[in-house]
Amino acid sequence: MFVLTISATTGYAFLQLKHTADGFITPLKGQKKLPLEVMQPVNVLLIGVDERKNDPGRADAIMLLSFNPKTKQATSLSIPRDMQVTIENGEKTKINHTYAYGGVEETIGTVEKTFDVSIPYYAKINMDGLIELVDAVGGVTVDNPAAFSWNDRRLQKDYAEGKIELNGLEASGYARMRKQDPLGDMGRQIRQRQVLEAVGMKLAGPNILTNLEKISSVLKNNFSTNVTFSEAAQLAQENQTGFENLKPLKLDGEGYIASDGVWYFFASEQSMQEAKQAIDKLMKS
C-alpha cells in the first residue's frame, strides 16, 4: 500500500499526507526514535487492533513484514490471533491478548521472542479505522477466489466468487474470514493483502484530492507508527520489487482446547522452524 500511494500521489497530496502522517509518530516506550536505514534488511510489525472507548482491545490481526532492499526480496507472515505464546511474565496466552496486557510493546516483544527476530518498527491501525478508511476512499474492488458467507453482530453477507465491490464493513469481514477458507490462515493473509492493495490503489488515484480531508482525519484518529512518512517513502522506493513479489509464509498447526479450558492454535514445530529460517535467510542475504 505504501508503494502504490507514495509513488503515485500528486505533489500536493503527498505533502498533505506527509503532514498528517508525521503527526501520529509514536515511538516505542523506552526507545528513542531510531532512523530507519532503508538500505539494510528490516522487520516491520503490522498490528490491527479492536480498540474501543474504555477498552484497550486486542490484536485482531498481526503480520510481520521482512524486507531486504539489497536482494529485492520480501516476506510476510500472518500470525494466527489464537496462537498460544509465552509472554514476558511466563504466562501462556493467546497472542492477540498481548496487546491488552502491554500494548504495542508487549505484542512486539512476544513476536520477537517467539520467532527469534528483532522488530524495531511497527504500524498499528484500529480495525474500525480500516472500515472508515475504505469508506473514505469510496469503497474497494477485490477478486474473491472462493464464495463464502460472513455473519457477526454487525454484518451478515454472502461474498460471491469473482470481482466484488465492498464498502468498509464488508471489506473488514472479507479480510477477517478464516474458517471457511480452504487455505485457512494463508487464505486470510491473501485477502488482507488484497484489501490493503485495493486501498492503496484508491489512495494513489486521481480522486484522492476530493477525499483528502476525510482520509487524513481517519488516519489521524486510527493510525500510529514509529516510521516517518519520508522514511516510508524511501522504504517503498528501495523495496518496490520486493513488495511486488512478496512471498507469504505459512504457519501450519492445529487448534484444540488446552488444559486451562481455552481453545488455542498450536503452530507445528516444522512450520515454526521454516518461518524462522526463511526470515533469517532474508535478513542475512
Q: Where in this protein do the model-derived segments appear?
A:
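Non-catalytic, solvent-exposed segments at the cell envelope interface
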Residues: 1, 8-285
